[in-house]
Amino acid sequence: MKTYNINKRINTLLLLVITMLSFSGCDLEPQEKFRFDPEVDPQFTFGSMTTWEWLQTNPNDEFGFMIEAIKQTGLQDMYNSKTETYTFFLMKDPNWTNNGPGFFSREFNLKNTADRDPKEVFEDPAVDLDIVRNYLLYLTLPIYVDQGPDHLKTLDLPYTFETLSEDVNNQIMTIARDWNYVMQINDSPDLPTGNLGKINVPVGYHNYIFSNGNSVAHIFGLNNNGKMARRYKFGEPKMDF
């Protein structure tokens, strides 16, 4: 008899606990998926400092070739603007110098530039500064695009943007973002294959905000090799897409 009463009490207690959990569970809101929130998510804000000023004060000295490219092409004012709206894609030194996928190797067949002085490399007769200039303009959008949903509303869908490039074959860039809001450049089946084959690059670092919020910069990831972010060599005759 005692055993029966004990079991009955245990069963009653378990039923009560289950009932309480069921009702409390109704009040629980579903866990929210990852959502980009510019007020919370990591961003790097530099006040009135411009992109040009920041590049020259970078403590790791990673942008020697980027700085020299801007100087050689006379684009300092663009990178130094406090009032115009731009999105810049920046490249660290290995993106310029890696043999094979690096800029000098792909555009000019210029190898082994990593240990050379940037000024000396840009003054090499093999380097066409018009091509360098258009490449920097290609990596510049005349609007503000961060990794949030304002321009990139749907996951894994490439959105098309017009760059500032004057090269007839290299004026369009596509940008997509994955579930974690990592931006991917030119990974779109709609882009022509081009004479460099399928080339795309992930963004390694996002949302460096300059010029009182008028400009934003993103830095290409190295991804073992610095891949270029478009598929046609610069300076060639117009291609029929």
Curated annotation (Swiss-Prot):
Where does it live in the cell?
A: Cell outer membrane
Lipidated residues (S-diacylglycerol cysteine): 26
> Which UniProt keywords are given for this protein, alphabetically ordered?
Cell outer membrane, Lipoprotein, Membrane, Palmitate, Signal
Can you locate the N-palmitoyl cysteine lipid attachment residues?
26
Summarize induction of expression.
Answer: By ulvan and rhamnose.
Has UniProt tagged this entry with the keyword Membrane? yes
User: In the record, which residues are listed under signal peptide?
Assistant: 1-25
What are the annotated GO cellular component locations? cell outer membrane
State the membrane topology: Lipid-anchor
Identify this protein by name. Uncharacterized protein P37
Q: Whose protein is this, by species?
A: Formosa agariphila (strain DSM 15362 / KCTC 12365 / LMG 23005 / KMM 3901 / M-2Alg 35-1)
